[in-house]
Amino acid sequence: MRRPPTPLANEEAPASTSFAAKYPGAVYAVRTLRTDAEREEAAALVQDRQRWLTLRGLPVPAQADVPALFRDPHTTSAGLFEDGKLLACMVPARDPGLSWGEGPCLRLGRVHTLPEQPDDITRLITLWASDLAARQSLPLVRAEILARHALQAEPIAALLRRLTDMGWDVRGSGPGREGDRVARLELTAEHRPRLSTLISCQTHAFHLAADDRSTA
């Protein structure tokens, strides 16, 4: 599946209006989760998200305790905020190359968004990640999403269509870093100089940690 020319835990409600119309004058920030309170807020968001997925019969990781991962001060986690409210959390890392990908990349691990949010949140993360990768001289962003069934089956097919509309390429499926079957995603890095008017990156140039298999 290829993307047209120019969210991640699993299902999101489709966006019905444009960014500008839905969030006029909104100020977003991506920053490292540095305090115990921020890390606990991220863990609670993950728990809410996993509960939301479970109630809808959608997959959650079978092996890893993801909330505990976000509570761990040794995890280099980040959050997307709007006026101080945490909208999403993730674990970005510099990766020398996943088993299914060639070459270095920015790996977006453990992406979780607030339940019942529009696709705009995933789109913000997509824009931010592609710009961050470019600023770190990395050619690609890679991510994985759980996919227990064929990629052509719903609801994963609808999610992948929305992600390809945002610029992601689907690179097939296979075992993920924790052994679950996943869909493999790639995004081309792209400098976006005007993005700072929408998203402030308050991460001190985001000195990405090297890949650590314990924090997938």
Task: Please describe what each predicted stretch is.
Residues M1-T35, E82-K85, R135, R142-A216:
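Terminal substrate-recognition subdomain of acyl/acetyltransferases
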Residues T75, R135-L138:
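Short, high-confidence coil segments that cap the C-terminus of an alpha-helix
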Residues W100-P115, E144:
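Conserved acetyl-CoA binding element of GNAT-fold acetyltransferases
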